[in-house]
Each structure stands twice: as structure tokens, then as C-alpha cells.
Amino acid sequence: MTQLTNFSESFSNQNSNLHQPYNFNSHQPPEENHYYVREPNGKRPFPVEFELDMEYVPRTKRRFDKISACLENFSISNDKPSPINICRESSSDEEMDEVYDDSNFDQCTESTSIPLVVEPDDEPAVAKKIRLDESIQRYFEKCRQGPIDFLPKPEKLKGNEMVIWQPRILVSPKNDFNMAGRIQEIDDEEEDRVNEEIKTRIIENEGMIDEDTRNETTGIVELGTGSDHSDIGSSWSSPMASPTGSSQIVELDPDSPNSLTNGSVTDEEMMEFE
């Protein structure tokens, strides 16, 4: 172990001799058997006056305290600032336990508050009035002297009036507790009629009733047939041939031997039709 330690010490000394600073701005090439290392530039040094107080404080905490100190006397309201925002300590990690009395509050507000500056108006108060045209001024003066003719006036009925104007009384629904005219009672017959209308509308909206097929018709549903022609008068005609295995609805004449009304259809065919 002793020899290994001595060997390592001699090796480190040898490297220290080879390691020399080199001016990278010079145009002279480096000498042989020497290597040069550029020392990295460190971060910007922290201000010395804050090193003692903020040595063990995280960066986020320091940033928070710095911004809080800048916004200590800042207020966006015109109200009197509270003593918590003005006379609080600069460090935010200590909680304020004592309550300031009125004397300390007045001293803080007098020293830190900024007086409000009231700027005078550039124009006199007369300029803020509305300036009217001469014709409008004459019209207003005429209306002051005599009553306006086109406005309705309370008079007795003469009997030859065409339309009697009655002012409408505006009543707020919030102040009107009388529900007359808003709620209408119905009897049992009216309730049944309304329920039937509601059921009909629901069925029509769901597509269970078609307006074109309200008339009762007789027909046979042929399942699994691939024929392109029908017996008599198909209710659905298309220039394209129906594909194999599709269903087809065919209307039949009542005199046809396969009609549903003449009794020639068996029970099995009726079950297939259903």
C-alpha cells in the first residue's frame, strides 16, 4: 500500500507539471508534451450583501421574497391600506402574531402612503352642457308655452271617436301574486283529449306512423326470394333489381287466389307473414 500511494503521488505531481494554463487568444501553437484545459466560466456571482441572509434559502423562496418586497406598498384600490400590507416584515416565513395598534398604524400610513393628486379640469363646467341647435331651442320654448297637440289628453268622450286610447298599465310578474290567466284548470274530458294528442305526437315523432301508409292495405311479405318481378302491382318499384335474399312487399288483388281475404292462405303462411 505504501508503494502504491507513493506511485500515485508521483503521478499526480507529474500531471500537475504538464497541466499549465494556456492563452487561447494567442496565435502561438502549444508546446509538445503539454496539454491545456479551458476553465469553464462559472455562474454569475450572487450579491454579497444577500449571501449571509439567503445562504440556505431556496431559489423559489428568494424570488418570492424579492417580489413581495417590491409589491409591499402597491395597492390597486383607493381604500385605506391595511396595516398587514404596509407594516408587515420583509421575510414571509415568519408569521405576524402581534396586532398593531392605532398609533403605529397612523405612523406607517403617514410615512408610506402617497397623497392623491387631483387634476383640475382643462375645460370649464359650462363646456360640459349640451349645445342645441336654434331650431330645437325654439321648439322646446314653444312646447313650454303651450300644450303639445299630438299627445293624448284626458277629456270626456264626445261619441264620434274612432279609436279610444287607453294607456297600458305595466305590472311586473314578480309583484303580481294573482295567478289568474296564467294557470288554467281542465276537466277530465279535456285531460283525456290532451293525453291522446301527446301519444299521437310521440308515435309520429318516433316514425311508427307514416303519412303515406295510413290507408289500410293487404299484402304479403316474401322473405328470401330473389325474383325480380311481382305478381300484381308492386307497391315499391325501382329500376334496380332487388338483391338475392332481400324482403319484398307485394300488394295483391282481393280476387287473387293467394289473397288474405278469400281464406286460401294457410296458417303457416299467416305466421310467416306476421
UniProtKB/Swiss-Prot annotation:
User: Which interval of the chain is the signal sequence?
Assistant: none
The annotated regions of Polar residues compositional bias extend over: 18-28, 239-249, 256-265
Q: Which domain of life is it from?
A: Eukaryota
Where is composition skewed (Basic and acidic residues) in this entry?
Answer: 29-38
Question: Which segments show compositional bias classed as Low complexity?
Answer: 1-17
Transmembrane residue ranges: none
Quick one: where's region Disordered? 1-38, 222-274
What name has this protein been given in UniProt? Uncharacterized protein R107.5
